[in-house]
């Protein structure tokens, strides 16, 4: 499976992640579709990507784990023999709360999944590419998906918004 352009899409099983996976597939990329609990949706997305003529492999990972970024990168390299050429950090958790009801656990989980792991995943890609070639530049990229909460602040979904 080497010498293919692989894209890792976190949260690639449904909604926007699915659409991103299909767009990459139609553009000729092979897709690593990450999911946490949406295995059925991930399998459907894999079939749609394959129907579009692209390879698609599924990777299951809880991004709230402290070492999720390294584990996910390890999985990708084991499956394809190389780090992905592109990562689309699309996965997130989105749980309702407000400032008075926010808990340390909820804030930490949101921050881990929505901020820490995506940034560490970018670092893991950098380190893998650098290990392989001695340099860390060229044809690799990382895309971080944000939503309207960045510009539309309001008190609902407090932990999500601050993460």
Where are each of the predicted segments found?
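Conserved glycine-rich cofactor-binding loop
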Residues: 6, 13-14
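Conserved glycine-rich Rossmann-like NAD(P)H-binding loop of the short-chain dehydrogenase/reductase
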Residues: 29-43
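The beta1-alpha1 cofactor-binding region of Rossmann-like NAD(H)/NADP(H)-dependent oxidoreductases
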Residues: 39, 60-72, 104
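Conserved NAD(P)H cofactor-binding loop of Rossmann-fold oxidoreductase domains
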Residues: 90-96
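Substrate-binding pocket helix/loop in short-chain dehydrogenase/reductase
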Residues: 98-111
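A short, exposed helix-loop element centered on a Lys and neighboring polar residues
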Residues: 122-123
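Catalytic loop of short-chain dehydrogenase/reductase
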Residues: 134-163
């Amino acid at each position: 499976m080497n010498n293919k352009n692989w894209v890792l899409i976190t949260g690639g099983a449904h909604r926007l992640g699915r659409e991103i996976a299909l767009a990459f597939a139609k553009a000729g990329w092979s897709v690593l579709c990450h999911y946490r609990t949406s295995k059925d949706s991930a399998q459907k997305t894999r079939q749609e990507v394959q129907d579009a003529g692209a390879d698609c492999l599924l990777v299951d990972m809880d991004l709230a784990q402290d070492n999720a970024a390294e584990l996910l990168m390890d999985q990708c390299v084991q499956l394809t023999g190389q780090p992905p050429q592109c990562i689309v950090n699309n996965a997130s958790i989105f749980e309702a709360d407000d400032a008075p009801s926010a808990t340390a656990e909820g804030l930490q989980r949101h921050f881990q999944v929505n901020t820490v792991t995506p940034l560490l995943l970018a670092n893991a890609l950098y380190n893998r590419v650098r290990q392989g070639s001695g340099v860390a530049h060229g044809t690799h990229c990382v895309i971080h998906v944000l939503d309207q909460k960045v510009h539309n602040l309001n008190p609902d979904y407090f932990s999500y918004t601050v993460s």
